[in-house]
Amino acid sequence: MKITAKAWAKTNLHLGVGPARDDGFHELMTVFQTIDLFDTVTLTTLDEELVEEGSVVKQLSVTGARGVPEDASNLAWRAVDALVKRRAEKTPLSAVSLHISKGIPVAGGMAGGSADAAATLRAVDAWIGPFGEDTLLEVAAELGSDVPFCLLGGTMRGTGRGEQLVDMLTRGKLHWVVAAMAHGLSTPEVFKKHDELNPESHMDISDLSAALLTGNTAEVGRWLHNDLTSAALSLRPELRSVLQEGIRSGAHAGIVSGSGPTTVFLCESEHKAQDVKEALIDAGQVYAAYTATGPAASTADQRGAHILTVSQ
């Protein structure tokens, strides 16, 4: 059996970071949105090989990006193991191989690894499920703070460490430019720097919520915010000039996406987004730039991680 699932990239329209909790995580107030950059994960059963104990994953390969682990540390591999453990029946299973095709910038603050985990959960659910949405979300939260959102998609408010999700109402599509850097940033390092700098927390999203209801792109852009910006700029000062270039080129607003170093720019139209993308590339300050729209999907069954194909 071969199952391919797809999951979108995310960006944060707002990321407010509160104090660190006893468990080491920070209390967050965030607004997630999927954009139509994506990864796919293909799970293939190796029917000639049965596994009675230990991981059923025997091989993991990645194309489209360098530096992504191809062993049990990969979040997709861990997603298989976590969901297999939830089976009621403990009979032997076929071994599986995983292949990840990357279209989301790696270590860029766009939840590429979390998207892979979410797509993998959908694939395993199609293989040996159904487990039910509640179980999938529970396992997703165990795997990582962004995995539940990648599973569900759309535009959502996230609290707790980002795993407590509520749908948000929006009007229309937003046009984005995604500017990726050649080298990623470690999320723990960014949060550590944030704690050192100790900037003011911004936990109120009421103005952004109202702007999203209007569909007015300029108004949405006015309220984009990320508390991790100062930390990301401290670790990667060159991001400041990237943000300045995007605004100079005509974007309504630009912010660091999540923990960075990817930056995203909100534009009035698809045409304007193309202009900003070309300006960023011509300036020679970014590794790659893409245009994207959000929220990513036009149909409810494709708004989050979802199955593309199943074949025997």
Curated annotation (Swiss-Prot):
Pathway: Isoprenoid biosynthesis; isopentenyl diphosphate biosynthesis via DXP pathway; isopentenyl diphosphate from 1-deoxy-D-xylulose 5-phosphate: step 3/6. ATP binds at residues 105-115. It holds the Pfam family GHMP_kinases_C. SUPFAM superfamilies: GHMP Kinase, C-terminal domain, Ribosomal protein S5 domain 2-like. Gene3D superfamilies: 3.30.230.10, GHMP kinase, C-terminal domain. It catalyses: 4-CDP-2-C-methyl-D-erythritol + ATP = 4-CDP-2-C-methyl-D-erythritol 2-phosphate + ADP + H(+). It is an enzyme of class 2 (transferase). The keyword Transferase applies. Keywords: ATP-binding, Isoprene biosynthesis, Kinase, Nucleotide-binding, Transferase. The keyword Nucleotide-binding applies. InterPro entries: GHMP_kinase_C_dom, GHMP_kinase_C_sf, GHMP_kinase_N_dom, IspE, Ribosomal_Su5_D2-typ_SF, Ribsml_uS5_D2-typ_fold_subgr. Its EC number is 2.7.1.148. One of its GO terms (biological process) is terpenoid biosynthetic process. One of its GO terms (molecular function) is 4-(cytidine 5'-diphospho)-2-C-methyl-D-erythritol kinase activity. It comes from the Bacteria. The active site is at 10, 146. Catalyzes the phosphorylation of the position 2 hydroxy group of 4-diphosphocytidyl-2C-methyl-D-erythritol. Belongs to the GHMP kinase family. IspE subfamily. PANTHER family: 4-DIPHOSPHOCYTIDYL-2-C-METHYL-D-ERYTHRITOL KINASE, CHLOROPLASTIC (PTHR43527:SF2). This is 4-diphosphocytidyl-2-C-methyl-D-erythritol kinase. It comes from Corynebacterium glutamicum (strain R). The gene is ispE.
